[in-house]
Amino acid sequence: MDILDKLVDLAQLTGSADVQCLLGGQWSVRHETLQCEGLVHIVTAGSGYLCIDGETSPRPVGTGDIVFFPRGLGHVLSHDGKYGESLQPDIRQNGTFMVKQCGNGLDMSLFCARFRYDTHADLMNGLPETVFLNIAHPSLQYVVSMLQLESEKPLTGTVSVVNALPSVLLVLILRAYLEQDKDVELSGVLKGWQDKRLGHLIQKVIDKPEDEWNIDKMVAAANMSRAQLMRRFKSQVGLSPHAFVNHIRLQKGALLLKKTPDSVLEVALSVGFQSETHFGKAFKRQYHVSPGQYRKEGGQK
């Protein structure tokens, strides 16, 4: 597994890509800000306007555009770029897909996907509020074609295909964004990973957070002085090296609490903590609940 695979795993992602919106006439659809959820709009036909909370001017969107809100920022899609009254769509089921129709005719058609994730997911928290891409990217073109094919008529195994597409779609969106020629806007762990001097160390810690990551070992892995390492981590990642290691250990611990029957002590030791008490205190500081309560409530705090 590479670092993107690991971050996807630690994010505890779940998702759906089974909503198709058909918009026509004088339409306006409001999406409120979501907590620990990302949202993707994929415009497959037509055009309209996107009004994003906090921005003063509407953005035109059209066929081929993909708009990704990693943290579910509130926004309005409309026919004229104005904040009109949000219409209640007519909803019907078309096989696996839920079809939402607003207005008469068809000015814009789009697929919508949603992703839930752990509140400390570096994968989503390190991205900008809005990511703009286009279906023209070869890999994205492929997965969008799959959505269109499965929505047109029920095929054998459609449910399995549609259920598998959200995670594929998200990884391809992330890959396409990170591969852009221009400088991408990142923060936190993602920014540190892209840093030429820190990237190797960050990848090693994420790969094996349970190892003994003392400052001397990290200095050697990054090939820089202790002072340089401290400054660069703070400026790029926003954490000290030690805090970063604990941050990743706790995310892995949260994942194991959710996915395995291991005791809290076993989880604590397997992610690099020396005792259940130390792990429990650190976990509660980050997740605001005890490890046992986190497991009981099903995670994604």
Swiss-Prot record:
SMART domains named among the record's database cross-references: HTH_ARAC (SM00342)
Top-level taxon of origin: Bacteria
Signal sequence interval, chain numbering: none
InterPro entries noted in UniProt: AraC_lig, AraC_XylS_family_regulators, Homeodomain-like_sf, HTH_AraC, RmlC-like_jellyroll, RmlC_Cupin_sf, Tscrpt_reg_AraC-type_HTH
UniProt activity-regulation remark: The affinity for the mtrCDE promoter increases 2-fold in the presence of TX-100, a known effector and substrate of the MtrCDE pump.
SUPFAM superfamilies: Homeodomain-like, RmlC-like cupins
GO MF entries: DNA-binding transcription factor activity; sequence-specific DNA binding
UniProt keywords, alphabetically: Activator, DNA-binding, Transcription, Transcription regulation
Pfam families to which the protein is assigned, alphabetical: Cupin_6, HTH_18
Effect of residue 231 to L: Decreases DNA binding
DNA-binding region: 216-237, 264-287
Domain HTH araC/xylS-type: 196-297
Phenotypic consequence of residue 227 to L: Decreases DNA binding
Further information: The MtrA and MtrR-binding sites are sterically close and addition of an effector increases the affinity of MtrA for the mtrCDE promoter such that MtrR binding is negatively impacted.
Annotated function: Involved in the induction of the mtrCDE-encoded efflux pump. Binds specifically to the mtrCDE promoter region.
Name this polypeptide is given: HTH-type transcriptional regulator MtrA
Lineage start: Bacteria, Pseudomonadati, Pseudomonadota, Betaproteobacteria, Neisseriales
